[in-house]
From Swiss-Prot:
One of its GO terms (biological process) is regulation of cell shape. Gene3D superfamilies: Mur ligase, C-terminal domain, Mur-like, catalytic domain, NAD(P)-binding Rossmann-like Domain. Signal peptide: none annotated. Belongs to the MurCDEF family. Its main location: cytoplasm. It is found in: Cytoplasm. This is UDP-N-acetylmuramoylalanine--D-glutamate ligase. SUPFAM superfamilies: MurCD N-terminal domain, MurD-like peptide ligases, catalytic domain, MurD-like peptide ligases, peptide-binding domain. InterPro entries: Mur-like_cat_sf, Mur_ligase_C, Mur_ligase_C_dom_sf, Mur_ligase_cen, MurD. Cell wall formation. Catalyzes the addition of glutamate to the nucleotide precursor UDP-N-acetylmuramoyl-L-alanine (UMA). Its EC number is 6.3.2.9. It holds the Pfam family Mur_ligase_C. The keyword Cell wall biogenesis/degradation applies.
Length: 453
């Protein structure tokens, strides 16, 4: 792909925009960056590009900038349906995501992972297994480093593993992973998509350019994912916790069984540090991806036994007076919370709520009624959540996370579990889910072991 002297517009600065602008400028492109934020807000990011000849259009998006560009590269946080982008597409301007741009310069085999929940854990674990098997591996995309940074560095790697959001997949054209993974699909980001089907269609684009030489790893326990299995051009590698498979990867009697083209490997899960029923799905997807791409089963098992998981995902904080406290701030949608609740049989005090993302809370109803003894709701969404779930168990509304933790401490009996799994984003009360999770853990760590109930 020739970039020298091409007029290229980068839409949205942030970390990815900086990485894209630096790469393009280094290749001799004539780069303009446009962002709706003003110079004062973007000054720290612009400082990172101060040594480069880049034009800026800030606080606005000018129509002519989009129409005059040879190529438009869109950062993940920018909706693809803003008017200037729609206009550019209508005028046959090439509009792509950073992932599409980077992939055009990659030569190493690529594993791409998407889904509503579990992406980051699966992506990280896949990278860990490849590394344990001796492959020099880049892990990035929607987590960590933008993929374009690998291309910029010129570093030679053996394997590339990327987490992809629906937003990144909206901007692909030729992107083709050798292994594409779809973990699950549940309602999410309905504050950005007009319909649920639009969100589903964006996720499915990960398979769009695959051929029969590639692999599509699909969670067949998810009805929505399974419904699209017959439409794949790639070879389908099914995963399941519920059924034994003639070919694929499945869970049976405390072990994960990988069975593919005459090869069979067994992985006893008792030695895994990563716990939770939902993590079996993530582990199976990571194993399938790596074993298909040349990994040794023994080395893969060693990586699994060493991997403890990631912060803010069903993270055990501490036990206080016989009550176990878990922080799951990354549980930002209903599907994620369902999986977290399924990890415990009963005696749960659930703290949930935050910024409403527009989905339905009723899929939680059965588990709340069956397993949740106390429901404590916070944030912007608490009233709507209360309307959907409040009649099913003992329900309380709290003004702050601090109040919710104190209330959970008083209400939960020894032997019970307090689970903070919001089913909402954090932006009504916190900067991001990480800050929210750290706040929760700090509050739990400050609880008095000897406090009365």
């Amino acid at each position: 792909m020739e970039l020298l002297n091409k007029k290229i517009l980068v839409v949205g600065l942030a970390r990815t925009g900086v990485a894209v602008a630096r790469f393009l400028a280094a290749r001799g492109a004539r780069v303009t960056v446009t962002d709706m934020k003003d110079e004062a807000a973007l000054a720290p990011l612009m400082e990172q590009l101060a040594d480069l000849d880049i034009d800026y259009e800030l606080g606005r998006h000018e129509r002519h900038s989009f129409l005059m560009a040879d190529l438009v590269v869109v950062s993940p946080g920018v909706p693809m349906d803003i008017k200037p982008l729609l206009l550019a597409k209508a005028q046959r301007r090439t509009v792509i995501s950073e992932i599409e741009l980077a992939a055009r310069f990659l030569t190493a085999p690529l594993v791409a992972i998407t889904g509503t929940n579990g992406k980051t854990t699966t992506t990280t674990l896949t990278g860990e297994i490849f590394a344990a098997c001796g492959f020099k591996t880049f892990v990035g995309g929607n987590i960590g480093n933008p993929l374009i940074e690998l291309v910029t560095s010129g570093e030679a790697v053996d394997r590339v593993v990327v987490e992809l959001s629906s937003f990144q997949l909206e901007g692909i054209i030729d992107f083709r992973p050798q292994v594409a993974v779809l973990l699950n699909i549940t309602e999410d980001h309905l504050d950005r998509y007009a319909t649920y089907q639009e969100y589903i269609d964006a996720k499915l684009r990960i398979f769009e350019n695959q051929t029969s030489a590639d692999y599509a790893v699909l969670n067949m326990d998810d009805p929505l994912v399974a419904a699209y299995a017959g439409k794949m051009k790639a070879r389908v590698v099914p995963t399941s916790q519920r059924q034994e498979l003639a070919q694929g990867i499945f869970y049976r009697n405390g072990s994960i069984v990988y069975r593919w083209e005459g090869r069979e490997e067994l992985f006893a899960t008792a030695s895994f540090r990563l716990k939770g029923v939902h993590n079996i799905d993530n582990i199976m997807a990571a194993l399938a991806s790596t074993l298909l791409m040349g990994c040794d089963a023994g080395q893969a098992l060693a990586a699994l036994e060493a991997f403890a998981g990631l912060p803010h995902r069903m993270e055990f904080v501490r036990e206080v007076n016989g009550v176990a406290w878990y922080e799951d701030s990354k549980g930002t949608n209903v599907g994620s919370v369902v999986k977290s609740l399924e990890s415990f049989d009963s005696g749960i005090t659930l703290i949930a709520g935050g910024k409403d993302k527009g989905g339905e809370y009723t899929p939680l109803a059965g588990l709340v009624k069956e397993r949740v003894g106390h429901l404590i709701l916070i944030g912007e969404a608490k009233e709507r959540m209360c309307n959907a779930l409040g009649s099913l168990t003992d329900t309380h509304l709290a003004d702050t996370l601090e109040d919710a933790v104190a209330l959970a401490h008083r209400l939960t009996s020894p032997g019970g579990v307090v689970l903070f799994s919001p089913a909402c984003s954090s932006f009504d009360m916190f900067k991001n889910y990480e800050e929210r999770g750290e706040c929760f853990k700090s509050l739990v760590r400050s609880l008095d072991d000897g406090a009365g109930r």
